[in-house]
Amino acid sequence: MTDALKLDWAVTVPPTVEPIDILELRSTTTGSYLRVDFTDDDLVLTALIKSCRTIAEQICSLAFAPQTIQAIWTMPQVNAGSLSGFKLLYDQDFYQYNESLGANPFSPAPFVLQLPQPPLTAVTLFEYRITAFNAWQTWPATVGSPPVANYVVDTLPSPGLVYLQYPPPAYQYRLTYTCGYATLPPDLKLALLQFIAWKYENRVGEDMPAEIQSQFMGNKVWVL
């Protein structure tokens, strides 16, 4: 396997609740972070919360709040319709590994997809299409009776993983999934508060302070 799948993704349902409440910023509230004792800048603060959260998510490759993402994996042009673009869990020829699966149906799945922007909550839809001109088809989580898993979702790792026993040969695979922290970890929340406060007090487009950037980079997740 020399070529990798091309990954494109987008947020289809953005967070409905931000990880930072505006009341946590105003000095009219006990324990607030910013020294702002008026409500005139509420619109500015609301916009900054969203903007800073989005920037921090891009730096960390994390979802700071619950959201829905749609990701598409495209096979390399020379391998379209084959399985050679998948990341193999084992350094073996696929056909040899497929033979081993026949001998032991409980073997680990040989293929894995890494889902960007953890933490992963759930995969709601797995689709594929043979060519760009074909309609998307649903790939069910299980097949047969008794049911046998086509794929297994693991939400514990970061990034989240989808293991596939034998994915359908196709040009593209599309997954829709939910992800994001229900409650932002304290270190990320503090870094986000500091970022918002800095942006509020420095509105001329200066570079992010190294101290704040290092806090985000210390939590960055790498998708291979």
Regions found by a protein language model. Name each.
Residues 1-224:
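Divalent metal-cofactor coordination and adjacent catalytic microenvironments
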